Amino acid sequence: LQLTGAGVLTAVIDSGIDYTHRDFRNPDGTTRIHALWDQTAQGMPPEGYDRGALYTKEDINKALAAETAEERKRIVPIEDRNGHGTAVAGIMAGNGSSSGGVNRGVAPGSELLVVKMGMTNERGFPRTTELMLGLDFVIREAIRAGKPVAVNVSFGNSYGAHDGTSLLESYIDTVSQIWKNNIIIAAGNDAVSAGHFRAVMI
């Protein structure tokens, strides 16, 4: 099957993205990123939201065409400081341009939709509210674009009931029924850390 993800949005809700990376650009050098919402930035947030800054495809292309790194950073100042979001985006949708087509992602023909989640500090994790806002944004944006969306959530914490009853779990279950979307949640990131225990209270 020649499935490339063409006509589909690939959403990455994570630590950001290196939007200058060649794997996220078209052969002519323009961006493959449909939109980028940085929840941590000061600027013009997406319509209906009260935080962060939204960068459109046009903004990103303008930044990519800038003559200096300083000018590029002034136009679209987003950074992915720990690289997690960039790595995830590459696995999902990298087109392999930086490796001569060898290392391509699962959907190299898709457009990217990126949310850099807000965090209380650089070494912390986003709150569940940031994740919920990110999910809301990418699904609304997919509806506006008229395209199905595959959403990856693999950056965050392991809080919650883990039985489907928490607010976040209920929210994900609800929004998964809206529009044409698939929400993929990482599991097992804590490995053998034994962060959860089962017990009977007497």
Regions found by a protein language model. Give the residues of each.
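Substrate-binding/access-modulating region of protease and related hydrolase catalytic domains
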Residues: 119-201
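Subtilisin-like serine protease catalytic core
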Residues: 2-129, 146-148, 164, 179-180, ...
